[in-house]
Amino acid sequence: SRWTSTEAPLPTEKSATGKEMPSIESANRSSKKSRRTRHDQDKLMPGAGIEVFTSSDGFKIFVGRNADANERVTHKLARPNDFWLHAEGPGSHVVIRNPGRIKEPSQVALQEAASLAAYFSSARGATKANVRWTQVKHVRKPRKGPKGQVYLRRANTTLAEPVSPKVLFAPPKPTKHV
């Protein structure tokens, strides 16, 4: 399978032939543990460095504000069917929660999350920025890679205007009735 990197070339991997396989019991124990962890994900608090927004059409959006927060957003809070976004260059990892397991995010949620990804990146001062997006199951962390670095597969690109969350999610101004 082909992977593309957001920050570094794709490393080559050697096969693990000749390596001892863990016993079936230990494999079952580890799979039960990972299942339990997945069910507990809703209980995880976003924590320091993570901002949470709600799109206009009701989707939760998580934004990592530093390398540690990016790691937590992408690899701890996000589920495989959630949508992951990142603007070109250094910036925040953004995740759109996908509880209904839909194949593509709504255009509203995608554009709002892409605007946040562009705003919380080195493209903040630009008029438009390319933002790559995919499902979290297509995002991988390289072995021994620095925090926040990922490889993508099957990524799409959208163009977004960097918009501050204060502007993007501002309450509507009241209208005057005369």
Predicted regions and their residues:
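Extended, highly charged segments
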Residues: S1-H93, R97-V178
